[in-house]
């Protein structure tokens, strides 16, 4: 027998042994799966006999949401069709009206940035136009319009080295807000990891400048995580604000998929906890996006963690994809499901819960409640 023929025979025999081993492995795998399925069926049958759990009674997201992803192995279509078109309840007010135009021109003339514009908030027409109550609301975005982080859900511009901070911004902001005649204002900001203090000093100065100019105004601040540094969190928390907000964004399991690698679940919890330590009178607040792949058990655990951290206010909103470059929507959650989550959170002891497809962390849904809550707290502190 030629050497080449012998070599081929040996290869055939070796392949046969490999196939035999693989088949045995598959048989074992199938056997294990069968056992697991049998155990699962038995457990489900037992749970059915015992009745539904609290979580099942409270909410089943599968009953209230539909998937928005393309089929496995295919790209999501950019054209609207029956499978990827937004549901009818996701309708925003048009961006028009006298109040809207007045606020837009004022913001532009002063060279200010708003998260309403930069993050493409769907509520800009309602908030800037005044909505049903006729009160115009804007959220001022401090420290520029470019962030040093790149979260997969966010439409704000990113750069490793954004433009330097405008040292006159605190005064500009205070003058603008005084001219608008507001009694409740929300500040937020981009992340500025390019500064040694991560922008905490600039943020705190803006708050204290406004407080000195308008002592009675109520100030809510939606802050970055300041990389979890206590001294920086304390600096902002004690600068004169009334509401300290920092967004968890999503459940622990999905943090890396949704947020920049420098953000994380435990760090954000610590930020909210530390703000209370630095200023116990503060109302603390956070926001969660739904429709990014979260599960019921994930949300329940997140709510428990937030309550254990002393968080007072939570909001739920639907994630909407800013562009095809961003993270796709996993599911559109119905208004009924949002209402159920509001009930669950209220039963867990949160002071206020805003929950709905169009709700955002800076949305004005809670302003009237927050104003009354804060005024009552201030009265108690004085007393």
Curated annotation (Swiss-Prot):
One of its GO terms (molecular function) is metal ion binding. It catalyses: [[Fe-S] cluster scaffold protein carrying a second [4Fe-4S](2+) cluster] + N(6)-octanoyl-L-lysyl-[protein] + 2 oxidized [2Fe-2S]-[ferredoxin] + 2 S-adenosyl-L-methionine + 4 H(+) = [[Fe-S] cluster scaffold protein] + N(6)-[(R)-dihydrolipoyl]-L-lysyl-[protein] + 4 Fe(3+) + 2 hydrogen sulfide + 2 5'-deoxyadenosine + 2 L-methionine + 2 reduced [2Fe-2S]-[ferredoxin]. Binds 2 [4Fe-4S] clusters per subunit. One cluster is coordinated with 3 cysteines and an exchangeable S-adenosyl-L-methionine. [4Fe-4S] cluster 1 binds at residues 116, 121, 127, 362. Its cofactor is [4Fe-4S] cluster. Gene3D superfamilies: Aldolase class I. Its main location: mitochondrion. Residues 132-351 form the Radical SAM core domain. GO terms for cellular component: mitochondrion. SMART domains: Elp3. Pfam families: LIAS_N, Radical_SAM. [4Fe-4S] cluster 2 binds at residues 147, 151, 154. Its EC number is 2.8.1.8. Keywords: 4Fe-4S, Iron, Iron-sulfur, Metal-binding, Mitochondrion, S-adenosyl-L-methionine, Transferase, Transit peptide. It is found in: Mitochondrion. Transmembrane segments: none annotated. Pathway: Protein modification; protein lipoylation via endogenous pathway; protein N(6)-(lipoyl)lysine from octanoyl-[acyl-carrier-protein]: step 2/2. Residues 69-97 are annotated as: Disordered. It is an enzyme of class 2 (transferase). Residues 1-19 form a transit peptide. NCBIfam families: lipA, PRK05481.1, PRK12928.1. Belongs to the radical SAM superfamily. Lipoyl synthase family. PANTHER family: LIPOYL SYNTHASE, LIPOYL SYNTHASE, MITOCHONDRIAL. This is Lipoyl synthase, mitochondrial. It comes from Phytophthora infestans (strain T30-4). The lineage of its organism: Eukaryota, Sar, Stramenopiles, Oomycota, Peronosporales.
């Amino acid at each position: 027998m030629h050497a080449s023929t012998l070599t081929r025979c040996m290869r055939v025999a070796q392949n046969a042994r490999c196939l035999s081993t693989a088949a045995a492995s598959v048989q074992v795998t199938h056997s294990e799966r069968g056992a697991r399925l049998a155990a699962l069926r038995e457990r489900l049958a037992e749970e059915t006999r015992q009745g539904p759990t609290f979580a099942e009674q409270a909410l089943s997201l599968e009953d209230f949401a539909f998937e928005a992803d393309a089929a496995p192995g295919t790209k999501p279509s950019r054209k609207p069709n029956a499978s990827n078109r937004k549901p009818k309840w996701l309708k925003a007010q048009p961006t028009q009206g006298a109040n809207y135009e007045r606020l837009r021109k004022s913001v532009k003339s002063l060279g200010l940035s708003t998260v309403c514009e930069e993050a493409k908030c769907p509520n800009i027409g309602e908030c800037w136009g005044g909505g049903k109550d006729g009160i115009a609301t804007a959220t001022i975005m401090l420290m520029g319009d470019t962030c040093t982080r790149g979260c997969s859900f966010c439409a704000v511009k990113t750069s490793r080295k954004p433009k330097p901070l405008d040292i006159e911004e605190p005064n500009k902001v205070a003058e603008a807000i005084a001219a608008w005649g507001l009694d409740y204002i929300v500040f937020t900001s981009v992340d500025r990891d390019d500064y040694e203090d991560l922008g905490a000093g600039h943020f705190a100065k803006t708050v204290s400048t406004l407080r000195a100019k308008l002592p009675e105004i109520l100030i809510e601040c939606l802050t970055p995580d300041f990389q979890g540094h206590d001294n920086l969190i304390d600096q902002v928390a004690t600068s004169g604000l009334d509401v300290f907000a920092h967004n968890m964004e999503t459940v622990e399991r999905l943090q890396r998929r949704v947020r920049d690698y420098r953000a994380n679940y435990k760090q954000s919890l610590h930020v909210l906890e530390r703000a209370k330590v630095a200023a116990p009178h503060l109302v603390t607040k956070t926001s969660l996006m739904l429709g990014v792949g979260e599960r019921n058990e994930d949300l329940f655990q997140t709510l428990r963690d937030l309550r254990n951290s002393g968080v007072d206010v939570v909001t739920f909103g639907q994630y909407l994809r800013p562009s095809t470059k961003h993270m796709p929507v996993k599911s559109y959650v119905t208004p009924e499901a949002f209402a159920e989550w509001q009930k669950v959170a209220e039963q867990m002891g949160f002071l206020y819960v805003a929950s709905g497809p169009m709700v955002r962390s800076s949305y004005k849904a809670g302003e009237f409640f927050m104003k009354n809550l804060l005024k009552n707290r201030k009265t108690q502190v004085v007393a």
